[in-house]
A protein has these predicted regions:
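Histidine-acidic metal/acid-base catalytic patches
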Residues: 1-4, 9-11, 52-55, 72-76, ...
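Catalytic domains of carbohydrate-active enzymes, especially glycoside hydrolases
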Residues: 9-34, 53-57, 96-102
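Glycine-rich, proline-tolerant flexible connector loops at the mouths of alpha/beta enzymes
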Residues: 32-48, 216
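Conserved beta-strand edge residues that scaffold enzyme active sites
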Residues: 34-35, 68, 108-109, 211, ...
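An N-terminal, globular interaction/scaffold subdomain
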Residues: 43-59, 64-66, 83
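Glycine-rich, histidine-containing beta strand-loop boundary motifs that form or position
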Residues: 63-65, 103-107, 208
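Active-site-proximal, glycine-rich beta->alpha crossover segments in alpha/beta enzymes
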Residues: 93-97, 101-186
Length: 357
């Protein structure tokens, strides 16, 4: 496996490439252009310039997270073909720049949601949290404010400002879209892009819904093992894969994350893994935690063991970290706790690997 670290370019991150380079075991970054709106082509020269910057820092740039899918594609509107064509052009440009993996989201309207971006933990650190009753009682205006007020004036992934004006209208639109219709629109997209994913040697890893249950009346795509099987069955290309996000899937107490890792890695359909832990407060309330198994409710050792034993050879990254040591950063994406998480994951991987000698 290759360990990567999520990073935003163009001054939109408090973490520097030179700092990432000093984290043991990290070989590269997972990055994106948050300033290019969904549906527009990513220029090849822009991609190459960023890759050059990353390479000069001694790191690789082989993972993109994310190339956002335009909402018209998800809605199945007549304009979708133009946006799909642009997406395919971006894929070609990424391939020619040496990109190997694209992580992307198919949740409608928003990629993820937390009711609190700074939830105080008993050790004095802060983590993101989800409280279902609070979330369900929020207006659209308060939904946006709850996410933006604690963003430290940085772009939150999946909450790019361009989305805000249409959010209320989009949520209303999806009230009349069944899960079956939504999956039909997704299949149309997959059938269009997967032949090019194979031609361009690009692995696609769809990110699970976060949280993995119905939210604001929106259709759900991936929240449990059955929906993952359904999604992968929409297009049987080996490039049509899953980003196994342990924290997203693990928020549902009924999900057996090690079993998921075993099943879908054995199929060769997991090109990318996000490893993080969560602590369940109730069946639908949770907060994020430090990566260690003892700090949350997921057995990180068993997850890593399942990955290793079932042939995982893709990319992995420490996911959301707590805010510790008075760091000022994008919520969930500071340097310190994610660096600790990276070292912990590397240690687990080494222990599992050596136990199989």
């Amino acid at each position: 496996m290759k360990m990567v670290f999520r990073w935003w370019p163009n001054g939109d991150d408090t973490v520097q490439l030179e700092q990432i380079r000093q984290i043991p075991g990290v070989s590269g970054v997972a990055t994106m252009f948050s300033d290019i709106p969904a549906g527009e082509v990513w220029p090849k020269e822009t991609i190459l310039a960023l890759k050059d910057q990353v390479n000069k820092a001694g790191l690789e740039m082989e993972v993109i997270e994310s190339v956002n899918v335009h909402e018209d594609i998800k809605k199945g509107l007549s304009t979708r073909d133009e946006y799909i064509s642009n997406y395919i052009t971006t894929m070609k440009n990424l391939h020619e720049a040496g990109i190997k993996c694209i992580c992307y989201n198919l949740m409608p309207v928003m990629d993820w949601f937390r009711s609190r971006l700074e939830y105080p933990l008993s050790d004095g650190s802060f983590a993101m949290a989800y409280e279902h009753s609070v979330a369900q009682g929020l207006s659209m205006e308060k939904i946006i404010h709850s996410m933006m007020d604690g963003s430290q004036d940085m772009t939150l992934p999946g909450w790019e400002p361009e989305r805000f004006p249409a959010m209320a209208k989009d949520i209303e639109f999806y009230k009349n879209v069944s899960a079956e219709e939504y999956f039909k629109n997704i299949r149309y997209f997959l059938d269009a892009v997967m032949p090019y994913a194979e031609e361009y040697d690009l692995d696609f890893g769809v990110h699970p819904d976060d949280p993995p249950w119905p939210l604001f009346g929106l259709p759900k795509v991936i929240g449990n093992v059955e929906s993952i099987r359904t999604f992968l069955g929409l297009n049987d290309s080996p490039r049509n894969g899953l980003t196994l996000c342990t924290g997203s899937l693990g928020a549902n107490t009924e999900n057996d994350v090690p079993a998921m890792a075993k099943e879908f890695c054995a199929m060769g359909r997991v090109p990318f893994v996000h490893l993080r832990n969560v602590r369940h407060v109730t069946k639908t309330d949770f907060h994020e935690s430090a990566h260690l198994s003892t700090e949350g409710d997921l057995d990180m050792y068993e997850i890593v063991k399942a990955l290793y034993e079932n042939g995982f050879d893709g990319y992995i990254r420490p996911d959301h970290g707590r805010r510790i040591w008075d760091e000022v950063s994008r919520p969930g994406y500071g340097l310190y706790d994610r660096a600790l998480g990276a070292c912990y994951i590397s240690g687990l991987w080494e222990a599992v690997a050596k136990s199989h000698r």
